[in-house]
Every structure is written in C-alpha cells, then in structure tokens.
Amino acid sequence: MDAAEYKHVVLGLIFLKYISDAFDERYAELEAEADQGADPEDKDEYVAEGLFWVPPDARWNVLKDNAHQPTIGTLVDGAMESLERENPSLRDVLPKQYARPTLNKQQLGQLIDNFSNLKVGGQNSQGRDVLGQVYEYFLAQFASAEGKQGGEFYTPASVVKVLVGMLAPYKGRVYDPCCGSGGMFVQSERFVEEHKGRIGDISIFGQESNPTTWKLAKMNLAIRGIEANLGRHNADTFHHDLHPDLRADYILANPPFNISNWGGDRLRSDQRWDYGVPPTGNANFAWVQHFIHHLAPNGVAGFVLANGSLSTNTSGEGAIRQNIIEADLVDCIVSMPGQLFFSTQIPVSLWFLAKNRKNGFGQEGRPLRDRSGEILFIDARQIGELEDRTHRVLSDDDMAKITGTYHAWRGDGGEYEDVPGFCKTASLDEVRAHGHVLTPGRYVGTAAMQDDGEPFAEKMDRLTERLTLQFDESARLESIILEHLAKLRTTTNGREHE
C-alpha cells in the first residue's frame, strides 16, 4: 500500500485513540463520582466537557481485545460509523475502509497494538499534546513519502512558524481559505499558548477544496481540541466561498502554486478583483486578491507564493502587482531558501500585506509605527541547513532572525537597521524605479566582506608567493608522472617483442 492510502489508515487510528483516551479519562472521573449520582454512560456528561461521545462498540479496548481477529477491519469501520452517528460534527469525516481486502489485517492489528502502548499521560491536555505531535509527525512523513501530492495537505513546519511568528495572531479572527490539514491553525493556537495568551481570544475560519484533505483538517484540529469553522463540507474557495462576509484580522495561507485550471473564465466580473482581473491561466493573483478582499480594516495577511509572482508581467499580472503596491498594501517580502517543500523545488517567497499601515497593533497589543510608503525586503535564501539530500529545514534561530527583523522594523520590539545582503527598507519610489518588481535580491545588495586587517600589498605578495610554490609543485608532480608513464611504456613494449 502506498503512502497516500496508508496515511488514512494510520491517521484514522490516531484520531480514534485520542478521542478514546479523552473519553476513558472522563469515564473514570464519573465512575469515581457515582455515589454523587454521576453516570459514566450519560452522553451529556461528555458533550458538556467538549468531548466526543464514544459508543461501546467504538471504544479502544474493544479494538485492542480483537486486534488479531480476522474481523478487525470490519470492527474498526463499525467504530468509525458509530462515532459519526453519535457525533454530528464528525459526520462524513472519518475513514471507513479498514475492511477492504487489500488492507493487511495482520499489520492493522500490529498498528492497534503499537498505538495501545502509546503513553499519553494522565491528563487530557498532556494526552492531547502527545497525540497531536504524533499526528503532526505522521502528516510530515506522509507528505515526504508522497512528494508532490503531499504538498496538497502539508506545509513544512518551519514555513508555518515563520508566517505565524511574523503576524503574531493574539486576538481576533484567523482565516485560511486553502487550509490543507490545518497546520496554520495549529501553530496559531500554539503561538497564543506560548505567549501566555488566551485560546478563546482567537476564532478560526477555514476552507479546503479537496474532500480528503478537508477530513484530515477536521481530525487534526479535533485531536488538539481546536474549535474551527471549516464549513459543513469541502468547497472551492473561488467558486463557492463558504465565508463570504468574513473580514479577518489575520490571514495565513499556502495556496497551490501557479494553478491554471481554477475556472477563472467564469469569474471575469467577480467583486474580489479590485486590482485587476487575474489571468485564467494562473491563479496566483486571484489568491492574493481573495486575501485582500477578506481582510478587516486593520487586518494583516501572510502567505506563500512562487517567486515568479514577484516579477512576472505575463497576462496582466505585473499590472495587478503594481496596483497592489501603489495601494500601499505590501508590508514585507521574504525570499525563502530552496528545498523547504516536499511538493516542489520551485523557489518561494512570503508576502505580508497590511490593510492599514499607518498604525495598527502588534505583539501583546503594542502600537506599530507608520510604515506608509515603505516596504521591508528580507533575503533569507542563505539560511537553514539540509536535513537530507533534498529537504532543508530552518532552526529556531533562523526563524527568529526573520521574525525579529520584521517586528523591529514595524516598531514592535528591538531596533531595526538595514543589513547588506539580508534586509533593506525600500521606499515606493525605489520600487517604482525597479518597475514594481518585488524580488528582495534587487534591494538588499550583497553582504559586506569582513576586513581581516591585512594590508593589500602584503596580502598580494603572500598570495603570489603561495601561487608560485603551487605552480612549482605542480610542475614537479607532472614530471614524476611523465617519467613513470615512460617507464611503463618501455616495459610494455619489451613484453610485446618477447
């Protein structure tokens, strides 16, 4: 079975294990309170705590006790069906293909054994964190195994962390119109927790067109106890916007790159195209304008686009980019290093737009400086390290370097200064002079060479002497090699005449 199929088997079981553990924990509490009238089989006791009700045939112990029976696939499918029937929010979300003949039932039983031994601790929050990390690990591994197709549901963690760290979503509405498996939302809630904020201060809205990926997102968020409005079903964001009236405080997104079959010919008069009608052959600037359309008056957006969007003039895209720049919406552009994504080797950049750049609020509600008429360019192509031959990752220090530069620049902590080769504040006049091209490399210049203090004349003499010695050594070695070749030739000729 390939990774694309296997992931649903594994992730479905992880989800079932999580909700069963949370259920069992509450069940034990109610049993202990039985003398006070508590009933562990009362569904309302679980719903009131924000937990899923797990009917008897769907409980993990039932599956564990029958893990090596030939009917285990049917039992797991039945458990999933029972969960959906008893919990309306899970309807049509869970995988139900465990009984199919192509699934090795012995391996399925071994998986159940392995997850049964997973130690998640005694507290619900601790269990959620451990299983959430396991779920995230498998998402990343399956994305890597699937390659290009894996990119449809997974954005690398380092990219998500940079986006979230830049926008710092403390309070308000967070929106991702192409949410994949929900990674932006998970990191947003994690950010709030790490900075001692209140989870209830952000509300989450999302949309996903792929039905399978939409289900992954629902399970991923449920495992972590994250409430989100992803709509009642999957839907195409361009043609069936599930949140038409939403004006978000934060938009985080990794839209599919350069898609040509987005149905743009049917949307030529759409109200979202304030800055120009996007070409039917590429949806990049349709996504950008969709984000802008859904921003609140003080909203900010951070998203990933292929580097071509920074400079293209094809099919009117240059004019759209120019109009967005002249509307003073572009706050920051970050060129990212290559090989971050499992799905593509296309170089990417992060765009940050702000609806109101005259003021606004940053981390912990601090007021921001007026950035009107300026754009921050960051060239981060040289940071990060290779995790393996094909994938690069960013360290915490790498990510902090990018996010810290942005926060300092917008007046949100620390002192900002241009760093040749890495970051530069450019005026709109400078951007106009470059033809409204937003490629950071055009603005940041090159890193300053460190002066080692050695006078030029002395360095020139030293290097010339070294080069002369290397030439002499090269000539000596060449002479020895030619001498050996001559001897070899003489010996060979002598043998031929014998």
Question: How would you describe each model-predicted region?
Answer:
Residues 101, 124, 178, 206-210, ...:
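Hydrophobic alpha-helical scaffolding
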Residues 6, 10-18, 163, 214, ...:
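Conserved Class I SAM-dependent methyltransferase catalytic core
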